[in-house]
Regions:
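C-terminal motif of bacterial Sec signal peptides marking the signal peptidase cleavage site
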Residues: 15-19
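Hydrophobic helical h-region of N-terminal Sec-dependent signal peptides
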Residues: 6-14
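Positively charged n-region of N-terminal signal peptides that target proteins for export
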Residues: 1-4
Length: 135
């Protein structure tokens, strides 16, 4: 009887450890965006220094970039521990709504007031390349 209880306790412990560990969950960047037609995108930096405005095909290129990101919702890193410049991406929709996205630390992105997601360094650096092409 003691063996059975010991085995059950070990199984419960193993299941608890496996079930409680944070497994990376992949999500698409499109979840960051609201439904609707974007008419303008302003991109600025924190600290201040850069300020761009895009519409038409250039705005679509930024939306395509954001939509195709492969994001991770569970990660070990603490975004608050990463320094560096933050891109502030402000989308203006045809219906008057606005959405602000923060792209920072060369690996994190979040919607204002929303959850933080992790992306690969390669995906994050693609935004800098895209801005260089569009400006």
């Amino acid at each position: 009887m003691k063996k059975i209880i010991a085995i059950v306790l070990v199984c419960i412990c193993v299941l608890g450890i496996v079930g409680c560990s944070q497994q990376p969950q992949q999500v698409q960047g499109g979840l960051l965006l609201a439904e609707g037609n974007v008419i303008n995108i302003d991109v600025s930096s924190l600290p201040e220094g850069y300020n761009y405005s895009f519409s038409g095909a250039d705005a679509k290129a930024i939306i395509d970039y954001l939509s195709t990101l492969n994001l991770e919702s569970n990660f070990e890193e603490n975004p608050n521990e990463y320094d560096g410049m933050t891109w502030v991406i402000s989308l203006k929709y045809e219906n008057g709504d606005a959405l602000t996205i923060y792209h920072f630390g060369n690996m994190f992105i979040r919607v204002k007031g929303g959850s933080c997601y992790k992306m690969t360094y390669d995906e994050a650096s693609r935004f800098d390349t895209l801005l260089d092409e569009l400006k």
